[in-house]
Amino acid sequence: MNQIEKTGELSASRFTVRDFTELVKIGIVNSNTITAFTGMWLAFQLNGISFIQNVDVIFFTIVGSALIVAASGAFNNVIDRDIDGIMERTKNRPTMTGKISGKRALMVALVLGVVGTIMLFMTTWQAGVLGVIGVFLYVVVYSLYAKRKLVSNTVIGSFSGAVPPLIGWFAVEPSFSMVPIMLFLVMFCWQPPHFYAIAIKRKDEYAAAGIPMLPVVKGIERTKKSMFFWVILLTILPFFMFDLGIVYVILATLLNIGWLALSVYGFKMADSIKWAKWMFIYSLNYMTILFVAMVVISIFL
């Protein structure tokens, strides 16, 4: 048993709410819950299904989605203990400081995952299966393998990050249509430029940890080209979402043009780290505005 584990065994019983939120990566939980809610809300609105008469579905979908995302974050913290201490942004995670032992973190992850999955299956079996697939993709395919072995790790990890809006939709309306497909693609295409911005800022840390992020393996200029490519793909998607009305299409297009302009500016800007910070901030605002707009605009359809 290493020193972290020894310390963890002594202090695990005293971990705080803040330690718990850091263990489950509460920021990621919140953002994924928003996208799951959006998928669910649009399924209600666009299919003429009563929101008020399905309070149980709403509860199980939102809480279940939050729990499986939280479980995935906790699993990831357990898996990454060997590299988290090397990186500045992760060295103070509770699994590194000893506030939560590896065994305790694993137990928390298992409980959250099982309870969350059961709740999703209480909506529709399709939502439950999607939840299981999402956790498997993130924990096994991404965290255990792709993150450490493949330069395409970010793209592979984007599959799991695009699952929550599908869960929300299929919990209400378990059939495919253009809207849930586009929600998946929006989230899938949004993640590479978002996480590549982080990778550029933390390039040296990822290199020290031996993580083959795109900026580490191919360089920053190559990463900028990839980010530009993914933003271009995003600019196409609104034109397949006229079910949400012309106002949404215009708003999404304007947001995409802004992000595209910022992406192009990156090829001329000498300070790549500063530019990456701008890209990161824009990506967060982009997702928030876009998904809130989907909810609000759909009310008036």
Curated annotation (Swiss-Prot):
Key words, A-Z: Cell membrane, Heme biosynthesis, Membrane, Transferase, Transmembrane, Transmembrane helix
GO BP annotations, alphabetical order: heme O biosynthetic process
Recorded topology in the membrane: Multi-pass membrane protein
Gene Ontology cellular component list: plasma membrane
Pathway the protein acts in: Porphyrin-containing compound metabolism; heme O biosynthesis; heme O from protoheme: step 1/1
Enzyme class: transferase
Subcellular locations according to the entry: Cell membrane
EC number of this enzyme: 2.5.1.141
Membrane-spanning parts: 20-42, 55-75, 105-125, 126-146, 150-172, 176-198, 227-247, 249-269, 280-300
Substrates-to-products reaction catalysed: heme b + (2E,6E)-farnesyl diphosphate + H2O = Fe(II)-heme o + diphosphate
Pfam family, one: UbiA
GO molecular function: protoheme IX farnesyltransferase activity
Broad class of where this protein is predominantly found: membrane
Note: Carbon 2 of the heme B porphyrin ring is defined according to the Fischer nomenclature.
Subunit composition and interactions: Interacts with CtaA.
Similarity remark: Belongs to the UbiA prenyltransferase family. Protoheme IX farnesyltransferase subfamily.
Function: Converts heme B (protoheme IX) to heme O by substitution of the vinyl group on carbon 2 of heme B porphyrin ring with a hydroxyethyl farnesyl side group.
Protein name: Protoheme IX farnesyltransferase
